[in-house]
Design a protein with these regions (language model features):
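An N-terminal, helix-rich hydrophobic module
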Residues: 1-110
Length: 111
């Protein structure tokens, strides 16, 4: 990721975080920040439910992704919030998280 892409990613994250819907949800803000920071770090390890739970959502090291769906539920919630934000606000770019994935991406916004 070059500097211009990183800047656009940060600007879009900040735009989302300043939205009242996101501001009312500290968990979604924390998760969004984590996903963007992870992308910016260039970490090549694919995100998994365990990493999301322990590093982003505060679960302890004993977290078992086979029995606890909390990170998956929060990711679905975040995807929904992203979709709603872009329906309301539009914009040139948008942050997306593909279904069944945890990695965030910046893409051109399609009407």
């Amino acid at each position: 990721m070059d500097d211009a892409d990183a800047l656009q990613l940060c600007l879009e994250r900040d735009r989302l975080l300043s939205d009242p819907e996101f501001a009312r949800s500290p968990i979604m803000c924390k998760l969004l920040r984590f996903l963007v920071d992870y992308k910016l770090s260039g970490n090549s390890v694919p995100l998994k439910s365990y990493i999301i739970a322990t590093d982003a959502l505060g679960r302890n090291a004993n977290f078992d992704p086979k029995t606890d769906s909390y990170p998956r539920v929060q990711m679905v919630r975040l995807r929904r919030m992203l979709d709603n934000f872009y329906l309301r606000n539009g914009g040139e770019n948008r942050l997306v998280i593909a279904p069944n994935q945890y990695a965030i991406a910046l893409e051109p916004n399609r009407p």
